[in-house]
Design a protein with these regions (language model features):
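Terminal intrinsically disordered/low-complexity segments used for targeting and assembly
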Residues: 2-78, 126-131, 138, 169, ...
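Small/polar, glycine/serine/threonine/aspartate-rich low-complexity segments that form flexible
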Residues: 55-64, 113-150, 273-290, 319, ...
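Transmembrane beta-barrel architecture of outer-membrane proteins
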Residues: 69-71, 144-146, 192, 237, ...
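Membrane-embedded beta-strand positions in outer-membrane beta-barrel channels/transporters
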Residues: 73, 146-150, 194, 239, ...
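Sec/SRP-type N-terminal targeting helices
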Residues: 84-85, 101, 141, 155-183, ...
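Periplasmic alpha-helical coiled-coil/stalk elements that build and connect Gram-negative outer-membrane
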Residues: 177-293, 404, 408, 428-431, ...
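A short glycine-centered flexible hinge/capping loop motif at secondary-structure junctions
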Residues: 225-229, 433-437, 474-478
């Protein structure tokens, strides 16, 4: 008897082992994950030499000491619909992670069921169709009632649910980083529009000064023509100049309006509650980048952090897809009362208990699991390649923006010298007029080259500010990777 039991146990063990091995054998050759760029590969080319500086600080715009800009950015962060949408994506990702996590926990539900039925006299339960109280049958009508607790638990031995939950948590962490990327895009966008408007205000002022000078020249030439002292050619030449300046003034005013409307949309202002923007001087900005990039760039760029989390989530999804090849175990149980007559439902004899352990092993699925694994792996490798390219693009952004900024700084130094040279010429013309060596018209027109060079200097200053903000963005704008959200 004992030998027979041992033989049966051995046979069951052999069959179980064979089944498990055959199940694992269903996995075809899985391709390896693609390599991610290593931190030591994240650096500028050796022939690029830029001034060194530190990483941007959080709330970098406050270092510009501009209360107007502070107020605009604060309003943007509090009322932006784009940012609100990003935060809702966070909530959605969190709920998805919670939903998957809940599916792997113990599930308990209260069960109540009432079934009024007529038993067929020709069916499998035909004896119960008889009306024979002596035999315990009073058919054909019965009212079956069931009440109790039903419980179920998936034993996630191979990590199908665990990996799926980890992937969902990775997607949530990516959503957090994407929200930071949206904030960075909004703050830099507001700052760029704001200083573009400030540059337009200053350009408008210089153009109006230029118009005043040319207007004086027009009146002076008109007076000379009226007195027969010169031909009309200088007068009409000055008139053409003033019309050209008027055209530039109209264009700058239109640009101010366009910039204001773009800023209005970005900060979420209505038609009547756009704050007044007063002219202020453009700030001087830093032109350097951190001495090294490496892992710091990965941790300080929110878009790269988001991509990194999506890569991790894709790898977790691959683990979940692989685990589907292995046997799954679950346990179901019921404890309660069941009776075919309502008047006996709550009697002790109506108690019922079910304990149902289950095993499921995929053997023949037409290649569905392998196709799912191949597709999941391909999607993961695509995400890795996208991440690698994003890292390279981030390094490119730093190199390009840093180089442009340094070039603009060099150009500004040379342009400042040109402005000083024309100012010297103007001062000389003014001095000659004071000594009676030249006319007032010549002394006044000597301001025109100065104003022209000051406009060129203003354009460089504006480009410097905009480019520095762009560099700030490419360095992450003071972002640092938030603490990892993990499963509780």
């Amino acid at each position: 008897m004992i030998n027979r039991q041992l033989s049966r146990l051995l046979l069951c063990s052999i069959l179980g082992s064979t089944t498990l091995i055959s199940g694992c054998a269903l996995v075809r050759k899985d391709s390896a994950p693609h390599q991610q760029l290593k931190p030591e590969q994240i650096k500028l080319a050796d022939d690029i030499h830029l001034a060194s500086s530190g990483w941007p600080q959080a709330q970098w715009w406050k270092q510009l000491n501009d209360p107007q800009l502070d107020a605009l950015i604060q309003r943007t962060l509090s009322s932006s619909h784009t940012l609100a949408e990003a935060k809702l994506r966070e909530e959605k990702a969190q709920s998805q992670a919670d939903l998957l996590d809940a599916g792997s926990q113990l599930q308990v539900a209260a069960l109540g069921m009432l079934n009024r039925q007529r038993v067929s006299a020709n069916g499998f339960l035909s004896p119960y169709a008889m009306d024979a109280p002596a035999l315990g049958m009073d058919g054909p009508y019965y009212t079956e009632a069931t009440v109790g607790l039903f419980a179920g638990l998936d034993l996630d031995l191979w990590g199908v649910h665990r990996s799926a939950v980890a992937a969902a948590i990775g997607a949530h962490n990516a959503a957090l980083a994407e929200t930071a990327a949206v904030e960075l895009s909004l703050t830099t966008g507001v700052a760029q529009l704001y200083y573009s408007m400030q540059a337009s205000y200053q350009m408008l002022d210089l153009l109006e000064q230029t118009r005043d000078v040319i207007d004086y020249a027009v009146k002076a030439h008109q007076s000379k023509v009226a007195h027969g002292l010169e031909a009309q050619v200088p007068f009409h030449g000055a008139r053409a100049q003033i019309l050209a300046v008027d055209k530039q003034i109209a264009a700058v005013k239109g640009q101010i309006t366009e910039t204001r409307e773009s800023l209005r949309a970005l900060i979420g202002a209505g038609a009547s509650d756009m704050p007044e923007i007063k002219p202020v001087a453009l700030p001087r900005v830093q032109t350097g980048i951190p001495a090294t990039l490496s892992y710091e760039l990965l941790a300080r760029r929110p878009d790269l952090q988001a991509m990194r989390w999506y890569v991790q989530a894709s790898l977790d999804q691959v683990d979940s897809a692989r685990a589907l090849f292995y046997p799954s175990f679950d346990i179901k149980a019921f404890f309660g009362l069941d009776a075919i007559h309502l008047d006996t439902l709550f009697k002790k004899t109506s108690r019922q208990f079910n304990f149902i352990p289950g095993l499921k092993l995929p053997l023949f699925d037409g290649g569905r699991l392998n196709a799912n694994l191949e597709g999941t792996r391909a999607a993961s490798n695509m995400m890795i390649e996208r991440y690698n390219q994003s890292v390279l693009n981030a390094v490119r952004d730093v190199a390009v923006n840093g180089t442009r900024l340094q070039t603009l700084n060099d150009e500004r130094e040379m342009q400042a010298e040109r402005v000083e040279a024309t100012r010297f010429t103007q001062r000389a013309a003014e001095a000659a007029y004071q000594r009676g060596l030249t006319s007032r018209l010549q002394a006044t027109e000597a301001r025109l080259p100065v104003l022209a060079e000051e406009m060129s200097l203003l354009m460089l200053d504006s480009r410097l500010v905009i480019q520095s903000i762009q560099l700030m963005k490419s360095l992450g704008g003071g972002y640092q990777a938030a603490p990892v959200v993990e499963k509780k």
